[in-house]
Amino acid sequence: MNNFIVFEGICCSGKTTTTKLLSERIKELGYETVYNHGAMTYTDLGKKFKKNLGKKDMPITVSYFFTDLIINTKNIIKPYLTKKNTIVLQDRYFDAITTYIKAYGDYIKTDYNIYDIPKAFVENDILIEPSLSVFCIPPFEIIKERMAKSKESPVHDFYR
């Protein structure tokens, strides 16, 4: 059974809070949960790139995102999914990455439709199709309010 639940949404949309609340409830039901923050969090490559987010051109950005995501999937997500009674709660996966990049392409009037890339990676067992994707979409005013209160970070600053 694929116990892989992904939470997608922009910064400050409530993904982490929702994931933590769900994790508590799942543990009450007798299952183990693993919270995984995803791209640009755990690998040296991802941490290095996170510091330079917004300073690289889009093809390089896409390459870094997917390389880091592939490493994260192989080294963190897949091993946990082999454990019995374990549910991986993923804070962003490939939907957020492809959507951000597509939206940026639309903004600069360039075709950055890369949705076929994660699809090919899933079909070739490089990335994993989530058993459930949860899209956190609060009203825009709430996002703005939360973003104003959020700490400075290359990721948040990129989307401000």
Q: Which residues does each predicted region cover?
A:
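Phosphate-binding P-loop
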Residues: M1-N2
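Walker A/P-loop
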Residues: T16
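ATP-dependent small-molecule kinase phosphotransfer cores
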Residues: N36-D116
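A glycine- and Lys/Arg-enriched "phosphate-lid" helix/loop adjacent to the NTP-binding pocket
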Residues: I97-R160
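ATP-binding Walker
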Residues: C12-S13
